[in-house]
Each structure stands twice: as structure tokens, then as C-alpha cells.
Amino acid sequence: MSDLPFTLDQLRILKAIAVEGSFKRAADSLYVSQPAVSLQVQNLERQLDVPLFDRGGRRAQLTEAGHLLLNYGEKILSLCQETCRAIEDLQNLQGGTLIVGASQTTGTYLLPKMIGMFRQKYPDVAVQLHVHSTRRTAWSVANGQVDLAIIGGEIPGELTESLEIIPYAEDELALILPVFHPFTKQETIQKEDLYKLQFITLDSQSTIRKVIDQVLSRSEIDTRRFKIEMELNSIEAIKNAVQSGLGAAFVSTSAIAKELQMGVLHCTPIDGVVIKRTLWLIFNPNRYRSKAAEAFSQEILPQFATPDWNQDVLKLVQKKLVVNVLDAAIPNTSDDG
């Protein structure tokens, strides 16, 4: 077969249909007409001489050949993106793109500060921040869609061998109360006092809520006895609800610095209990790393790491993250080790 039987655009269309589940939604996501999408798929099936979709059901289902082409197609598209970014790097940070991933709390309260510092130094580098669940973010790093990420949740077990996972910072979680709550007059409260509060929480599947449950359990506090007033879907909504007097909540201290300074929320320590979780820096050591990612990792990341881990982060990043195209493609035959 001398000529390739497909184009990059056709691979993008195939991927969009697989993700969206229908030709129409795929067309909408690609900003093209549905007939154009259908025609490209028909041409692709004719060129390959195999059906790629089972059109019998309500949802467009890939055939075995469709799954096979999608698997290779995603790798081809990813490699094309890496190639473009490697060429951009020839401009020596006078352009290019840095793509950073984050889970909800780190993406809302930590990464914007880091990106702001980076942009001041490298204003010509475009920066994208992708904020999703820990699981989705980890997969994005593994697939090469994101250069690196800082997350607070549990990384999927199937990815632990393919990712470099570095303990990056400690995130302290605090109990916040309305400023007019009686407990604000006390220097600390006791564990038993928690059972008297009405709590506002994230949903039961959220990472932070699971961490809080685990840490409190180690301190012999049974969160199953907590009175849950309401469940909300964002930290900002929880802060506003507490500020309005609807209940108490546990949130990251990074999320309440402004409110504490303004005096609109109160942080009350629990006697003998400190709630901390580890934030993780993750990246794929087998993927090409742009100069923008190297600069961000070496110049910005160490400034926000927990002091005890600062040097470890810097050493690991310098050792692991500086990977160029030749390193990724050609085995090292030198004697440098």
C-alpha cells in the first residue's frame, strides 16, 4: 500500500465520533457539518475496505476494525502534536505552549499563582491549565495531553508504573465556621464538639472528602456521625454557604487565605488534630518534554514545594524531566551512564 488510506482529519473525526457517541455531536465538536463527517467516514471505510461503525443502534458503536484504527490513530495524533511542539521549541521559549494539569483545589488556588510567575518571565509562551478530577488528569499526563500535573487524590493503580510520581507539597485542611458561631470564641474545640455541628461537604466521592474521612478516622473521629446539612459541588459554594451561616466545613487552607484576612470566615483548630494531605507532582518520563515544561519545572515548581521536599523535587525534576526527542527515540550508546 503506497499511499496512506487515511488523513489526520479523518483520524480526528473518528476520535470525535468515538468520544461523542454520534456523528452529529462529533460534527458539532469539530465545527463542521454532519454530512461532511459522514462523507469522510464513508471515504475512510471505502479506502480501508472495512466497516468502522455499527450503525444499528442509537449510539455510534465502533467495530473491531474501528477500535483498532482508533487505538493507533490516537497515538498518531499525539505524536503529531509532540512533533509540532518540538519544532516550536526551536524558537527557544519565544513561543510554544505549556500545558499543566491539576485537580480541583490545586487548579483553583495554587496553579494560577505559579502560572502567573511563569508568564511574567516568559510572556511569549502560551499556557493552558486543565482542571479535572485526579483520575482524568493522571490519564491526560500518561497519554501526553498534559506536560505535568499537581494533584491531591489517589492516582489510578494502572498508571503508577508509567508515571513519575513525586511528593510535592503538604496541603493542610482546616475547619471553617461562620464568624458569629459560638465556637469562634474558643481557642480550640474538642473532637466531641464536631458532632454538634451541621456540615456542608462536597459529595461523598470527592477526593478531599475521602482524605478528611481517613485522617479524622486516624484521630478516632467518626465522620459517619457528622450531621450533613448539604452537599455542594465546589469549594467556592461551600465557603459562601459557611459565610452565610448554613454550617461548618473542612477546606484546604490555600482556599481560605483571602476570607480569613477579610474576617468573613473563622478557622477553628481541633485540639490534638492536624489534617494534612500530600499533593503529588506527576509527569510521564517517556514523553517528549518541551523547553517550556523544563523551565516551569526547574524555575517555578521548587518555589512552591514543601521546604523539606524542595531539593528533592528540584533534583528529580532535573534528572527525570529533561527529555528531548533524541533521548526518546534513540537508545543511549554513550558511556556517560
From Swiss-Prot:
Keywords: DNA-binding, Transcription, Transcription regulation. The keyword Phosphoprotein does not apply. It comes from the Bacteria. One of its GO terms (molecular function) is transcription cis-regulatory region binding. Pfam families: HTH_1, LysR_substrate. Residues 6-63 form the HTH lysR-type domain. CDD domains: PBP2_CysL_like. Residues 23-42 bind DNA. InterPro entries: LysR_subst-bd, Tscrpt_reg_HTH_LysR, WH-like_DNA-bd_sf, WH_DNA-bd_sf. The keyword Thylakoid does not apply. Belongs to the LysR transcriptional regulatory family. Trans-acting transcriptional regulator of RuBisCO genes (rbcL and rbcS) expression. This is Probable RuBisCO transcriptional regulator. It comes from Trichormus variabilis (strain ATCC 29413 / PCC 7937).
